[in-house]
UniProtKB/Swiss-Prot annotation:
The gene is pulL. CDD domains: ASKHA_T2SSL_N (cd24017). Keywords: Cell inner membrane, Cell membrane, Membrane, Protein transport, Transmembrane, Transmembrane helix, Transport. This is Type II secretion system protein L. GO terms for biological process: protein secretion by the type II secretion system. It comes from Klebsiella pneumoniae. Type II secretion system is composed of four main components: the outer membrane complex, the inner membrane complex, the cytoplasmic secretion ATPase and the periplasm-spanning pseudopilus. Forms homodimers. Interacts with PulM/GspM. Interacts with PulE/GspE and PulF/GspF.
Length: 398
């Protein structure tokens, strides 16, 4: 999914070919004659690079490098579907989970449409975009730029491939030489709205006025909302470098306050008495970290005061480092949610209560944590939507 709003302004539409070395492009500008062209790395034609300096780019990538899936989420994973996708699809993949990127195309309650792409392929596509200096609006599988036919398929020929959009969130690319064999053996083939001259193959073709892939994409700007750049590959916002002396405090603030607000209050906010529960949860969480303080009036303000003291005195550098390491491990492990967090100063240890969508997710989290901590496993309880339990992470320098 993509947060960019569609626009009537000029957009550079680029289709990166399956060879990942060449591309075709079209400048779609309302009211103007469209410019089109091809890009080759050795041609020395600067046209595409010059256009990229003035116009945002919508990049279509080969669906032949994508796999489309539908999955049903467990009840407990509805709010954080991205973390569960890898484990739900693991048995259907031809590659290792760690080598795959999962993009959520659409979610309706527990029903999810997902595109799976090799992480190496995503890196190569992004590197290609960066090499041309593209300001990328979206990275979209090419078949999803075709019009959606509610009663059947839509199709267009692009180079040596036929592209088919088979439903709202899925499609396929077929090499021309294999098209006859594919369609001949397809049972109950849906009507095919065809935007290229139909091949001489027996199929329920419905010929339409000829348009190429980029023309169809230009007429379907809503498809820009479909974007593979999610998770590790999400667009990075440009920002000014942070002065080095502030970084430890910022890391601590983000780790403490993010974990505080996003995780520890999650279950409380689901209750009817949201305000009272949130206030009490804030105080309870604050007391976990500062157990000697009896008078807790404004936890957020008091936390900020402690952070200022940490900056001025250079206090708790090891704790800041460990919180940063823990946050990174959680970010890198799909299907994990931190429920509570406390620090045992006597043992120099972080104490966690976590929930996971599966025992495999929990084991993956534990393995990653062992690279930075000594991990002790406490009580574990199976649940309908996964497993929850307690872990103690002791610093290796203790």
């Amino acid at each position: 999914m993509n947060n960019h709003h569609t626009s009537s302004a000029a957009v550079l539409i680029i289709r990166l070919n399956p060879d990942a070395a060449t591309a075709i492009w079209r400048l779609a500008a309302p009211g103007d004659t469209a410019q089109t062209g091809e890009w080759h790395p050795d041609a020395g034609d600067p046209t595409l690079s010059l256009l990229a300096q003035r116009h945002p780019a919508w990049v279509l990538v080969p669906a032949s490098d994508c796999a489309f899936h539908r999955v049903a989420l467990p009840a407990g994973a509805r709010r954080r579907p991205q973390q569960a996708l890898a484990f739900l699809l693991e048995e259907q993949l031809a590659t290792e989970v760690e080598e795959s990127h999962f993009a959520l195309l659409h979610q309706h309650k527990t029903d999810c449409a997902v595109a799976v792409v090799g992480r190496g392929k995503m890196r190569a596509w992004q590197a290609w975009c960066d090499s041309l200096g593209l300001s990328v609006l979206a990275l979209t599988p090419d078949v999803l730029a075709l019009p959606h036919s509610p009663t059947g398929w839509s199709a267009v020929r692009c180079g040596e491939q036929w592209l088919f959009r088979c439903d709202t969130w899925g499609g396929m690319a077929v090499e021309t030489v294999w098209l006859d064999q594919l369609l001949t053996h397809w049972q109950d083939l849906a009507p095919i709205a065809c935007y290229s001259p139909p091949p001489d193959i027996a199929a329920p073709w419905q010929p339409l006025p000829a348009q190429d892939l980029l023309q169809l994409a230009a007429a379907n700007p809503d498809a820009r909302r479909i974007c593979l750049r999610q998770g590790d590959f999400a667009a990075k916002r440009r920002r000014q470098p942070t002065p080095r002396r502030w970084r430890p405090v910022i890391v601590a603030a983000l780790a403490l306050l993010l974990l505080w607000s996003s995780n520890c209050l999650h279950d409380h906010l689901m209750l009817g008495q949201q305000a009272d529960a949130a206030v009490q949860a804030s105080r309870d969480f604050y007391r976990q970290w500062f157990q000697t303080e009896k008078n807790v009036v404004n936890p957020r303000l008091q936390m900020q005061q402690h952070l200022r003291q940490m900056k001025n005195a250079g206090a708790r550098p090891a704790l800041i480092s460990r919180l940063g390491a823990l946050q990174q491990i959680i970010d890198d492990t799909p299907g994990i949610r931190l429920r509570t967090l406390s620090f045992d100063a006597a043992r120099n240890a972080l104490q966690l209560e976590i929930s996971a969508v599966s025992s495999q997710a929990l084991e993956q989290f534990s393995q990653r944590a062992r690279a930075r901590f000594r991990v002790q496993t406490g009580e574990m309880k199976p649940r309908a939507d996964g497993i929850e339990g307690r872990l103690t992470l002791e610093g290796n320098d203790a």
